[in-house]
Amino acid sequence: MTGKRGTAAGTDGSGNKKGKREFKAKLSGLLAEQTCRDSVKEAWEGNQGGQFGSVALDSVPFPHGVIHPFIHNSDFLEELKEELLNLNFQPKSNDLYQFKQSEDLKNRKESHIKALRHVLFEDFRQWLSNITNVELEKTVDISCAQYGYTDTLLCHDDELEGRRFAFILYLVPEWSKSDGGSLDLYGMDDNGQPGPIVKSLVPRWNSLVFFEVSPVSFHQVSEVLSDGKCRLSVSGWFHGCSLERPPRGLDHPPVRSPHIPHDDQILYEWINPSYLSLESQAQIQEEFEERSEILLKDFLKADKFQAICAALETQSITLEKCGPPNKRCYDRAHGDFPGVIGSCMELLRSEAFFLFLSNFTGLKLHFLASNNEESDEGEGPSEPNTVSQQGASSEDDKVPSCSGELRHWQHSYYTMIHDLDPERHEFALDLLLFCGCDDWEAEYGGFTSYIAKEEDEELLTVYPENNCLALVYRDKETMRFVKHINHKSQQRDAKNTKHKGFWDFAFVYYE
């Protein structure tokens, strides 16, 4: 990388070598005052809130503090900002976040970065240790992040062995609540899960937020809504003995049920005839067995699909918000489903559809389904099975089952991968059928990503598309999430007065 400079680095104006200039950052003078320090210490120990010089403390929803100003000399921060913006930032994106992150600042040699590192992990660490009575190690854990338009960091608690206090130093331009990018703090519900947002802290130049990392320290960086501002911050953790954590509650697994009796006629009423032929099903099964996924366009008959879309736009459907926010945020249709919507749910749960999926995928979702190992010995495709055929299942056979829901997606909705997901540790067939996706763009989010365990690279991405049926077979090492739907989606919603976001029928089938 090259650039125009007035003089060469490490020289004076005549080209002679000069000594390397050392910079020193100083904490705000108010932090050093004994009276202020004693008042903050007393308030922290008593779990009290209040303003103490440049330090604002609050215990709701969990103990945290805001220091402004944090650094004595604002000119130092301007030069620090310039150094930081010259670093290499990498885009980071997964189920939890989207932003740009710098390389580790632990060993950077730039003068202002080095000075900031010293003031944080020496001067401020000692100050924080003193007021909290917590012994903090000298471990340096620090990086820089840029949040631009639509970037976010969703609800999490910062849990990681050794992390004791988190901090964020803001280097932002004039910032207001309407710009987004606030640090949102969550309360806790009766089940020990994050509940509603209780407090939002708007970024401010030369302010530092700190809080204790604990089982209740759930927070997020809300989506940045300003298209012309950069939310620049330096953040990290002070390390020490971690707080003891209570066992986490398990998610209740979705209710599974076997198929409901229905003969083949329901398939002919609903499904595009091109998918019902022997040749089509044999070709689809061959492709599915090779790739473990397939997308079937124009899956339902046009009149049936149009009727579903019309019902979703006009009929009253009871929706319940699904959380908690550290795992998911979307609307689930609840209660009795009216008319054609209920009939579609019935189709997806029907005995005929279970066998139909078996013919598509080679999975044994019905006792009449062909055994792949046996059928491989024959020559050519066999006639697809139908529920009108006679047969009996073995008493030792597992009963195939499914769980399913109708979901509504709109701006700010998402799901996340989490360790206690009861669906993570089984082989399963995922089905997604999309509605109301007119003009939906990939940049809005809302797509379903499949990734391998412990990996960030996507194995497969399923984008919402009208009347498309997505089938994905996942093993125990494959996880999935729905990407956060960002502010760009509201441009599309503003043009469409009939409905916001989109819908999907989401089912999971088990052999």
UniProtKB/Swiss-Prot annotation:
The keyword RNA-binding does not apply. Fe cation binds at H156, D158, H219. The keyword tRNA-binding does not apply. Binds 1 Fe(2+) ion per subunit. It is found in: Cytoplasm; Nucleus. Keywords: Cytoplasm, Dioxygenase, Iron, Metal-binding, Nucleus, Oxidoreductase, Vitamin C. GO terms for molecular function: iron ion binding; L-ascorbic acid binding; peptidyl-proline 3-dioxygenase activity; peptidyl-proline dioxygenase activity. 2-oxoglutarate binds at Y170, R231. Its EC number is 1.14.11.-. It comes from the Eukaryota. One of its GO terms (cellular component) is cytoplasmic stress granule. One of its GO terms (biological process) is stress granule assembly. Residues 138-240 form the Fe2OG dioxygenase domain. Its cofactor is Fe(2+); L-ascorbate. Its main location: cytoplasm. Residues 1-20, 372-403 are annotated as: Disordered. SMART domains: P4Hc (SM00702). It catalyses: [ribosomal protein uS12]-L-proline + 2-oxoglutarate + O2 = [ribosomal protein uS12]-(3S)-3-hydroxy-L-proline + succinate + CO2. Pfam families: 2OG-FeII_Oxy_4, Ofd1_CTDD. Prolyl 3-hydroxylase that catalyzes 3-hydroxylation of 'Pro-62' of small ribosomal subunit uS12 (rps23), thereby regulating protein translation termination efficiency. Involved in stress granule formation. Monomer. Belongs to the TPA1 family. This is Prolyl 3-hydroxylase OGFOD1. The gene is ogfod1.
